[in-house]
């Protein structure tokens, strides 16, 4: 799935889900080290667990963050 982010430095997040587990998570743009680290940490994680852990994280004064945007993308995926 591809998700266009809003309000953060990254422009897009792509990921796949196999057996309710996250795989191939990639961010386009944003802080390279942070987004690579996040992608590696959540590889193989259950999507519901990822949503619980990432939902609502802020980045400085912004009301969202790259992790929060990923949680939103996963929620959208589940609604399909």
What are these regions (language model features)?
Residues 4-12, 17, 21-80:
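Active-site- and interface-proximal helix/loop "cap" or "latch" segments in soluble metabolic
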